[in-house]
Amino acid sequence: MTTNLLDFDLDGLAAFCERLGEKRFRATQLFRWIHQRGASDFDQMSDLAKSLREKLRGCAHVAGLQAISEHVSADGTVKWLFDVGDGNAVETVFIPEDDRGTLCISSQAGCAVGCRFCSTGHQGFSRNLTTGEILAQLWYAEHALRQRRGDGERVISNVVMMGMGEPLQNYAALVPALRVMLDDHGYGLSRRRVTVSTSGVVPMMDRLAQDCPVALAVSLHAPNDVLRDNLVPLNRKYPLHELLAACRRYLDHAPRDFITFEYCMLEGVNDQPEHARQLIDLVGRKAADGGVSCKFNLIPFNPFPASGLRRSPPAAVTAFAQLLSDAGIVTTVRKTRGDDIDAACGQLAGDVKDRTRVNERMAKLRTIEIKPVI
């Protein structure tokens, strides 16, 4: 069995090359070919010695993921469904905007956290993705979009680990992938432009702060433990006082001077003025008094079958945002993107609900021609 080079950060690739009797600079050349130029054929790598290319052909490969479907929303959002084997699929979403291109990447097939408002959580958990499978989503999207655009310029400027799965429950694979994204010989993204979203895995938040601090988003969704226990079951293990303390510790290392709190607006559940006032009391104090330097991103709920939940009316969202803003908390309302192709926040299970349906859907989708990006 040969080794997939997408599984390595630069240090890992250097160690691999050294085992082949090669110098570290060869790893840097190889790394650039893979991540900056999107090469998977060693014969394309013209500045590598022929002897090294022959060695690589015998022991290594560059294996991306098979895109078994691609859908383009009316707003330009692109969603890919990738086959990760054994009846599992993950979804990746590209969101184009005037000043940036953001890729939303999955870290797990399914999710074990089970948030009530998230369709992916209702799918259940299948397995962690490997480092190579996490990076393959970026590798595929960047080079496919760049090739189709035709000018060779970078397309993806921001990465958010907000797809399927809880990234911090796949820590061993996540951190090497983040390092490749940040490496100047890889994708060269700024730490401020790479965001890890977590539902609040407190010990791993502390480790990430030490190992690879990038921008952090926390799925908050409730202003008190009673409600959050119901919406985000992980809160029963790491309640709000522990979560906020971890956020304050993270800010000592973070590339941004604030934490983004994500808050899914659910009609009659967490969208009342009293909930906003509780949030202000929870985070709006000075850090020494238990507050957190933060901004809020209010997310309209994207309904899915059997959720039993409804999207908050626009007027309720506006009033909620105004209360937070009046208290001096920077607050935005997320624009819903890609909901016509089930690519919006919380929809990333699509209609993939269990392993049987995954297999049935893959068999069907492999007969469908992939649509071009426009």
Curated annotation (Swiss-Prot):
Single GO MF annotation: rRNA binding
Residue span, Radical SAM core domain: 97-340
Residues annotated as catalytic: 91, 345
Pfam families, per database record: Radical_SAM (PF04055), RlmN_N (PF21016)
Protein name (database record): Dual-specificity RNA methyltransferase RlmN
Biological role stated in the UniProt entry: Specifically methylates position 2 of adenine 2503 in 23S rRNA and position 2 of adenine 37 in tRNAs. m2A2503 modification seems to play a crucial role in the proofreading step occurring at the peptidyl transferase center and thus would serve to optimize ribosomal fidelity.
InterPro entries: Aldolase_TIM (IPR013785), Methyltransferase_A (IPR040072), RlmN_N (IPR048641), RNA_MTrfase_RlmN (IPR027492), rRNA_lsu_MTrfase_RlmN/Cfr (IPR004383), rSAM (IPR007197)
Cofactor or coenzyme needed: [4Fe-4S] cluster
Cofactor note (record): Binds 1 [4Fe-4S] cluster. The cluster is coordinated with 3 cysteines and an exchangeable S-adenosyl-L-methionine.
Similarity section: Belongs to the radical SAM superfamily. RlmN family.
GO cellular component: cytoplasm
Binding site for S-adenosyl-L-methionine: 165-166, 197, 219-221, 302
Chief location bin: cytoplasm
GO biological process: rRNA base methylation; tRNA methylation
Binding site for [4Fe-4S] cluster: 111, 115, 118
Broad EC category: transferase
Subcellular location: Cytoplasm
EC number: 2.1.1.192
Note: Reaction proceeds by a ping-pong mechanism involving intermediate methylation of a conserved cysteine residue.
Keyword entries, A-Z: 4Fe-4S, Cytoplasm, Disulfide bond, Iron, Iron-sulfur, Metal-binding, Methyltransferase, rRNA processing, S-adenosyl-L-methionine, Transferase, tRNA processing
NCBIfam families: rRNA_mod_RlmN
Recorded catalytic activity of this chain's protein: adenosine(2503) in 23S rRNA + 2 reduced [2Fe-2S]-[ferredoxin] + 2 S-adenosyl-L-methionine = 2-methyladenosine(2503) in 23S rRNA + 5'-deoxyadenosine + L-methionine + 2 oxidized [2Fe-2S]-[ferredoxin] + S-adenosyl-L-homocysteine; adenosine(37) in tRNA + 2 reduced [2Fe-2S]-[ferredoxin] + 2 S-adenosyl-L-methionine = 2-methyladenosine(37) in tRNA + 5'-deoxyadenosine + L-methionine + 2 oxidized [2Fe-2S]-[ferredoxin] + S-adenosyl-L-homocysteine
Disulfide bond sites: 104-345
